[in-house]
Amino acid sequence: LVAHHRDRVKITAVVVVSCSTGGKVPGIAQRVAKKSGLPTDVLAFDVNAACSGFVYGLISGLSLCQPGGAVIVCAAEAMSRLIDKTDRNTGCLFGDGVGAVLLEDRPAFREYNWHAGCDGDRVDLMRGEIGGGITLGGMQVYDRAVKTMSDTLNRLHDNGIKPAVVVGHQANSRILQKIREQVDAGDAVFVDSVEQFGNTSAASIPLALGTCVADRSIPATGRMSLVAYGAGEAWGGVSVDYDLTDAIALHGS
């Protein structure tokens, strides 16, 4: 991604999102910046907000965008480190993956908007740690995921700007379908890549976008709404203009 855009824009920041690093120091972002050949004046930092991490990374990255510059937001997850493979309830749900996007402030782009938050009183609904497995609060998580993401999208669309594409955290196809039924998004394409990748936590949204780029299943330009809900009951959504005419399907799992 850096090589593809190096001659066109100056990359000023790198945001790497992950909940599966094990808390290593230094962070991944500094290593990504070095291996990508970026200059030493680039801002680089990690974000951990579990399944909402990519949306949080986007909010951070968009706030750092300046005319003539660009920000890379990358999500990398190795959920195989966290799952208990003997647990039939969760072991089969999660996958590993990585995806990245490049953000720019272009004159033609309308102002983005976002809405996010968390409820620390509900931290026990979803938990995970390396070697300790993942625990989920069953139907309570399902119900709250549907309500929270639906409410967030409807709030994002209150300004009257309807998206061409909606990409939710790819945790469960039934959740995505329920959100689709409850959100006023006009004729927007609702992306679902759960069957292909499973739940890749923070990497699920960029992986889904990479699939759309590869199969050209969404318009090349327009407005996009992205939304997520996850552990710590962290949640968030972003509505932003996009341009995929020069995009490359650089993703993996």
State where each predicted segment sits.
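Conserved active-site "lid/cap" helical segment
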Residues: 1-12, 128-164, 174-185, 208, ...
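Flexible, glycine-rich active-site loops centered on histidine and acidic residues
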Residues: 62, 68-95
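Claisen-condensing/thiolase-fold acyl-transfer catalytic domains that form or cleave C-C bonds
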Residues: 20-21, 39-41, 47-68, 164-253
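Acidic-glycine-rich active-site phosphate/pyrophosphate-binding loop
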Residues: 24-38, 70-79, 124, 175-186
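Active-site pocket-shaping loop/turn-to-helix segments
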Residues: 20, 45-52, 90-92, 130-151, ...
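Condensing-enzyme catalytic core mediating Claisen C-C bond formation in acyl metabolism
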Residues: 85-147, 154, 229, 241-253
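Short beta-strand segments
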Residues: 17, 48, 72-77, 103, ...
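Glycine/charged-rich beta-loop-alpha catalytic/anionic-binding loops adjacent to active sites
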Residues: 10-15, 34-48, 80-86, 185-193
